[in-house]
């Protein structure tokens, strides 16, 4: 049976600062524009994007990551408590910082005359600093206390998530540094630039896994898991749209498809499990009350 956590009274602190809300709101329009260009006008990246993306699935992957970000930041604007969104800023920070690095490394390949490149550069040269500042200042608001009738994520599940995330980070990190083997073996054609962007997207998802595994409160994971569902659904649709460009004769295409579908099933299953857990009980047992105290102590230590 799922462990359901409950607290009495109003949680002090755990606020989302106005500056954090403002930052989240200012990022959303950029992401929506990117989704439109990459997911709807996929064949017009030379005219409408920061660089020409010849493989449509590469464009759809980036658009899917942007969709996850747009959902997350939209929720952040209206979040009631900091811990609902706090864990998601670290993956965003990693994504933005690495995109900035990729931009510098492949600077000559970008279409500097396109307005999209100006927006791209403005976004990725400023976002890492702004997101890091928002997380650093706002993190002190996390009291470590769960929501009313919160659900505790089992330790075993969090250990598995952390292990998968760490393995994924090492693999994606090595491919980011040395993209040649990835280009040779991947499910669709890649260039060095699109290969590195793909690695950054994989790093984003795996940092999510590691960051979320550090907190037992489901309320700290829910928005982020929902964001992953948004991205994974769009990726599945993207595979269907661009299936003729996949290299189905190799294992990478099948492994990619199975991995995406499996991740989507796990995310949807976790949302169902947590919803069911919240519905089972509306008052804590003595054991659950003790678990509230333990989770609060652990999460407060991490947040500080």
Question: Could you say what each language-model-derived stretch is?
Answer:
Residues 2-88, 103, 117, 181-190, ...:
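An N-terminus-focused feature that recognizes amino-terminal "leader" regions
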Residues 39-47, 103-112, 176-184, 239-247:
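Juxtamembrane "helix-exit" motif on the non-cytosolic side of transmembrane helices
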């Amino acid at each position: 049976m799922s462990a359901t956590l409950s607290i009495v009274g109003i949680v002090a602190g755990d606020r989302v600062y106005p500056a954090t809300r403002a930052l989240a709101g200012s990022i959303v329009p950029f992401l929506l524009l990117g989704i439109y260009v990459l997911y709807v006008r996929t064949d017009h990246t030379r005219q409408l994007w920061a660089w020409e993306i010849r493989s449509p699935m590469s464009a759809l992957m980036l658009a899917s990551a942007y969709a996850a970000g747009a959902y997350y930041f939209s929720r952040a604007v209206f979040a009631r408590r900091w811990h609902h969104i706090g864990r998601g800023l670290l993956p965003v920070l990693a994504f933005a910082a690495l995109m900035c690095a990729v931009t510098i490394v492949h600077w000559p390949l970008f279409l500097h005359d396109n307005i999209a490149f100006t927006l791209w550069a403005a976004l990725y040269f400023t976002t890492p600093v702004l997101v890091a500042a928002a997380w650093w200042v706002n993190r002190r608001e996390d009291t470590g206390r769960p929501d009313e009738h919160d659900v505790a994520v089992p330790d075993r599940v969090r250990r598995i998530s952390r292990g998968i995330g760490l393995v994924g980070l090492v693999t994606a990190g090595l491919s980011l540094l040395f993209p040649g083997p990835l280009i040779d073996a991947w499910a669709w054609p890649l260039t060095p630039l699109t290969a590195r962007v793909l690695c950054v997207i994989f790093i984003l998802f795996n940092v999510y896994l590691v960051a979320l595994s550090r907190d037992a409160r489901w309320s700290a994971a829910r928005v982020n898991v929902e964001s992953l569902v948004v991205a994974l659904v769009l990726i599945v649709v993207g595979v269907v749209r661009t299936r003729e460009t996949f290299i189905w004769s190799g294992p990478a295409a099948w492994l990619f498809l199975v991995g995406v579908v499996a991740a989507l099933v796990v995310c949807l299953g976790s949302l169902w499990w947590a919803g069911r857990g919240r519905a089972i009980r509306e008052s804590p047992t003595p054991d659950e009350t003790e678990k509230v105290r333990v989770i609060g102590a652990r999460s407060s230590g991490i947040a500080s």
